Regions:
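Active-site-adjacent substructure of cysteine-protease-like catalytic cores
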Residues: 247-327, 332, 338-339
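Noncatalytic regulatory segments and standalone regulatory/sensor domains
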Residues: 2-169, 305-423
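Generic hydrophobic secondary-structure signal
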Residues: 174, 186, 201-204, 278, ...
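Active-site-adjacent bridging/hinge elements
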Residues: 164-181
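Cysteine-nucleophile protease catalytic domains, especially the papain-like/related folds used
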Residues: 3-6, 10-52, 179-262, 415, ...
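Generic detector of well-ordered alpha-helical segments enriched in charged/polar residues
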Residues: 65, 92, 220-224, 247, ...
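Residue-level detector of functional hotspots within protein domains
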Residues: 172, 182, 190, 270-272
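Short, well-ordered loop/turn elements at secondary-structure boundaries
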Residues: 132, 145, 159-160, 168-169, ...
């Protein structure tokens, strides 16, 4: 491949065999590109068009290249005949009926930080655990090949700023070695059995079913059958789902979801509600408007640490209607504008700002330049109060002359009063 990464050489597992398994040590951009081209079955004709052409026209190359950019030297253990439950389900209810032939098997990449100095089987699980980054499933589907991916965020989040994300514990077995990874699941849509909407459902249910015994996982065929009950046309190949249908699927999965529209409330309130749920440890689905007829769905799983120096610069009024008491409150939701997302068009743990911008004599919430339209929150059935109601109750209590801040503020010294509240 002619470009800044040099020419493409052939890569095969036979060249890197480690006691019967395929082990690759990636220590240069050249070799990383060669490996990705081999694992994704890039033809020589495509490779000859250059690195930039591949990044523009193959989403899997683009995402994997960006994802592995932070790992300067790493080792990949490849399992050739891996059975992935999501792809195998899609294969039997859709791909097996197509005219073209698709294999039933995937490849799974197990990634380790640095080089493995010894034979893979000479390591014990505890030694491998210290280097374990996670796993990536490669489906036998052109262009959108990345399947279920479980990666530790510590290798991919910014090292110069703290972040807070929701993760679940996954146990994986790599050629008999049992390893653990704390991750939020990621995967790409295949464009036929799954769109971004179905991927949002799959990854959220994967996280919740892994974290809490009350929930169970749904496969693509099960999601399709649930949606068919509320649809008036065929579901395969998929054309995507509305956020009303996404919410309906979560109802069927045992959740009591709450659906918010950014157009039906002040943008500042919508942004506050997003912050409240994320700060409460509840991953949510976000609906974006890419173009007039083009929508996209992603998952918000956390936020970056806000700058505390901004505390107190934005104040919100809490008033009590009975006594006319007024208290000015600094809401930490005003400090958070940088969130962590799982977007199947980008690498896992993508960091983006959610800000309010002016557009055509109005204002919209913008995320990476796209308008935020919806937020779907998969709530537990016992969570009676949703965020907006809980906020109103808290603000009324704060301003209450009987139970609020003023009821016990007389016990504070003057310095505490100065930095904590003011009339």
């Amino acid at each position: 491949m002619v470009n800044e990464v040099g020419e493409m050489d052939s890569v095969s597992p036979d060249d890197h065999n480690n006691s019967g398994i395929s082990v690759f040590e990636i220590d240069s951009p050249d070799y990383k590109l060669n490996f990705l081209s081999w694992i994704l079955d890039i033809t020589q004709e495509e490779a000859d068009k250059g690195f930039e052409f591949l990044k523009r026209n193959n989403k899997s190359i683009e995402v994997l290249w960006d994802l592995l950019e932070n790992l300067k030297v790493f080792t990949v253990v490849v399992e050739d005949h891996y059975v992935d439950r999501v792809y195998r389900d899609s294969y039997y209810f859709y791909y097996s009926g197509k005219h073209f032939s698709y294999t039933r098997f995937c490849k799974r990449l197990s990634i380790f930080d640095g080089k493995l100095e010894k034979n893979f089987f000479d390591y014990c699980s505890e030694e491998l655990q210290q280097k374990f980054v996670g796993t990536i499933v490669i489906r036998p589907i052109p262009e959108r090949s990345i399947g279920r991916t479980l990666l530790s965020p510590k290798y991919f989040l910014p090292i110069d700023k703290n972040g807070y994300v929701r993760l679940a514990k996954y146990v994986v077995t790599v050629f008999g070695k049992q390893l653990e990874v704390w991750a939020f699941p990621y995967g790409m849509q295949d464009g036929e059995t799954t769109s971004c909407a179905e991927v949002t459902i799959l990854n959220l249910l994967d996280y919740y079913s892994q974290s809490y015994p009350e929930y169970h996982y749904l496969l693509p065929s099960e999601i399709s059958h649930l949606v068919e009950k509320s649809s008036f046309e065929r579901r395969m190949p998929t054309t995507g789902l509305s956020y009303e249908l996404i919410s309906k699927v979560f109802c069927e999965a045992g959740f009591y979801p709450r659906l918010y529209s950014a157009k039906k409330m002040p943008k500042n309130k919508f942004r506050h509600i997003l912050s409240y749920y994320i700060e409460s440890g509840i991953p949510v689905a976000i609906g974006l408007k890419i173009a007039e007829e083009n929508k996209h769905s992603i998952i918000c799983i956390g936020h970056m640490q806000p700058e505390k120096i901004q505390l107190g610069q934005i104040l919100n009024c809490a008033n009590n209607s009975e006594s006319d008491n007024v208290v000015w409150v600094s809401d930490t939701a005003d400090l958070v504008d940088t969130y962590c997302f799982m977007d199947d068009n980008k690498r896992p743990y993508n960091i983006s700002e959610c800000v309010e911008v002016a557009k055509l004599n109005t204002s919209i919430l913008s995320l990476d330049g796209f308008e935020v339209e919806y937020m779907m929150v998969p709530l537990y059935k016992r969570m009676i109060l949703e965020a907006a109601d809980a906020y109103d109750i808290c603000m009324s209590v704060i301003a209450s002359p009987k139970f609020g801040i003023k009821s016990f503020s007389q016990e504070w010294d003057s310095e505490t009063k100065k930095i904590t509240w003011k009339y």
